From Swiss-Prot:
Role played: Part of the ABC transporter complex CcmAB involved in the biogenesis of c-type cytochromes; once thought to export heme, this seems not to be the case, but its exact role is uncertain. Responsible for energy coupling to the transport system.
Binding positions (ATP): G44, D45, N46, G47, A48, G49, K50, T51
Coiled coil: none
Protein's recorded name: Cytochrome c biogenesis ATP-binding export protein CcmA
Cited InterPro entries: AAA+_ATPase, ABC_transporter-like_ATP-bd, ABC_transporter-like_CS, ABC_transptr_haem_export_CcmA, P-loop_NTPase
SUPFAM superfamilies to which the protein is assigned, alphabetical: P-loop containing nucleoside triphosphate hydrolases
A single MF term (Gene Ontology): ATP binding
Swiss-Prot/TrEMBL catalytic activity: heme b(in) + ATP + H2O = heme b(out) + ADP + phosphate + H(+)
Entry keyword annotation includes Nucleotide-binding: yes
Chief site of localization: membrane
Broadest EC class assigned to this enzyme: translocase
Amino acid sequence: MIEPLHTAPPLLAAHALAFSRNEEPVFGPLDFHVDAGEALLVQGDNGAGKTTLLRVLAGLLHVERGQIQIDGKTAKRGDRSRFMAYLGHLPGLKADLSTLENLHFLCGLHGRRAKQMPGSALAIVGLAGYEDALVRQLSAGQRKRLALARLWLSPAPLWLLDEPYANLDLDGITLVNRMISAHLRGGGAALVTTHGAYAAPPVRTRMLTLEAAA
């Protein structure tokens, strides 16, 4: 007797997910999923709810309607925060700490064991030699690179990236694409928001388009 093949559930799935603010709909209801080894590219104009969607998924905003599943199981808010690494518009860095101190601090703050040494992460994002530089001395692009180093250190399998190409030059955009590709090759997944004309990362990509509420 041939046993049926068992297909692994999606790394993340959303069912009838919706969010409103002051009784005005922001997005939804949405149904989508992302498998291990692929990226979900979330597109839409400003005001379409891209950032809000990622904040809901990350557990930073309450789920009003719908369901979020991780590996086929309904995920509570705290479970999602441990499973996901969120890179938002604000880098979330300590201005009076050095780049290296920030990475050590943030790893300890979340109680996560980094998958690499912080110094190696700085080199990967092009900040070798800036270990002792204070964050307040960095340019916007350098701060974005430091936030990318923090992302790289996270063991979370799902990356939530809100406009990751913002404040980056062409080399920085290439860096983001390489990081996403490496993360997916390791069995991770990524949700990436964009409203610009940037090329999608060179990986297996699923598309989700949001439209601003009327």
